[in-house]
């Protein structure tokens, strides 16, 4: 184990020092909800065991962003600077989600330079969960709730403070910067403190603590399952599940002109919306909720896995907690695979 222990009463001071050099994004209260936001004051940070309502996805893949601009003379606007950012307090499910987005935006046939620039300018600091939250099923997706290697530093909390485990060279450099700043309250992890970083057993395969939730077998049989129509009946097509999801990445482009300046924007979209697949001819290959809801589940559990090697559901439970119709993606997948779907 390689890392340090940060006393709990020093975490705010540590965040304040980081804010002198970096944009720090962390869980904080906003209108009563716990969300990831850019901190204006280190006292805002909330590092309890409560799950954030939204994931930090929007700080790497913004809900709306300008990607190109030019004036009437043909002058193209220069790309804006990407601030050096620390994403702090990212849960294992959201770290796994960032692996999915990285596979889609960087490791596929094309590289999304906007996502890549933000990712390269970001230091990821993970935070383990202590307990399972309502709607969560990360361990049934094969994700440990209290550990992750998909970050630069990983924090584990106990009554004394936080064990900061160094995962990457970027993480080591950050801790070296803090130490160089004269902070002497860090204790190296060694001897009796080594147990501080011991995690719950989270083995996979034959030793998995939970049965792994996935869609297997013949893809066409799942696609043609006659239960999709009944399953989708309760869906109201609001798109909340897509906007709250840490892995959803559908988007659209639109152009806007103002005072001689034209800009192209990218903004989030959702396959749950009727017009998402509407053709200019008027034809829509997904005309009803049945086709759209099936697409959402199949995309997450089958198509992304086929194309990029990951299941695009990390069991974070946000869609389960947020759906106004009470739809549960875990129950849907289990019901489809077991043939036991029932409307509750």
Locations of regions flagged by a protein language model:
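Short, well-structured alpha-helical interface segments that form or flank functional binding sites
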Residues: 88, 226, 230-236, 240-243
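A generic structural-conservation signal
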Residues: 26, 244-245, 322
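Residue-level detector of anion-binding/catalytic polar loops
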Residues: 23, 241, 319
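Active-site-flanking alpha-helical
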Residues: 98, 246-250, 324
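Ferredoxin-type iron-sulfur electron-transfer modules in oxidoreductases and energy-metabolism complexes
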Residues: 210-233, 251-344
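Internal helical hairpin/lid segments
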Residues: 239-256
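Iron-sulfur-associated redox domains of electron-transfer enzymes in respiratory
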Residues: 1-218
């Amino acid at each position: 184990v390689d890392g340090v222990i940060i006393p709990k009463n020093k975490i705010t001071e540590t965040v304040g020092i980081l804010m002198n050099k970096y944009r720090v994004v962390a869980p904080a209260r906003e209108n009563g909800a716990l969300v990831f936001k850019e901190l204006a004051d280190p006292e805002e940070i909330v590092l309890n065991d409560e799950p954030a309502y939204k994931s930090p996805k929007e700080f790497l893949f913004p809900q709306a962003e300008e990607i190109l601009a030019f004036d009437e003379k043909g002058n193209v606007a220069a790309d804006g600077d990407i601030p050096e950012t620390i994403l702090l307090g990212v849960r294992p499910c959201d770290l796994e989600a960032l692996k999915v987005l990285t596979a889609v935006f960087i490791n596929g046939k094309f590289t999304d330079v906007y996502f890549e620039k933000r990712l390269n300018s970001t230091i990821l600091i993970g935070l383990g969960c202590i307990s399972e939250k309502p709607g969560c099923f990360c361990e049934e997706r094969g994700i440990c709730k209290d550990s992750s290697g998909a970050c630069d530093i990983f924090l584990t909390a106990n009554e004394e403070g936080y064990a900061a485990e160094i995962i990457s060279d970027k993480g080591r450099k950050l801790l070296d910067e803090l130490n160089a700043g004269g902070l002497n309250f860090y204790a190296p992890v060694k001897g009796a403190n080594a147990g501080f970083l011991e995690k719950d057993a989270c083995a996979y395969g034959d030793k998995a603590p939970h049965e792994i939730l996935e869609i297997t077998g013949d893809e066409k049989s799942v696609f043609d399952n006659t239960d999709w129509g009944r399953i989708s009946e309760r869906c109201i097509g609001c798109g909340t599940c897509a906007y709250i999801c840490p892995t959803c990445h559908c988007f659209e482009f639109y152009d806007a002109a103002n005072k001689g300046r034209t800009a192209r924007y990218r903004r989030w979209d959702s396959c749950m919306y009727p017009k998402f697949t509407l053709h200019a001819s008027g034809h829509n290959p997904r005309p009803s909720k049945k086709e759209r809801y099936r697409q959402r589940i199949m995309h997450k559990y089958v198509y992304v896995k086929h194309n990029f090697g990951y299941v695009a559901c990390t069991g974070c439970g946000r869609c389960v907690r947020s759906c106004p119709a009470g739809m549960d993606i875990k129950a849907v997948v289990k019901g489809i695979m077991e043939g036991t779907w029932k409307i509750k």
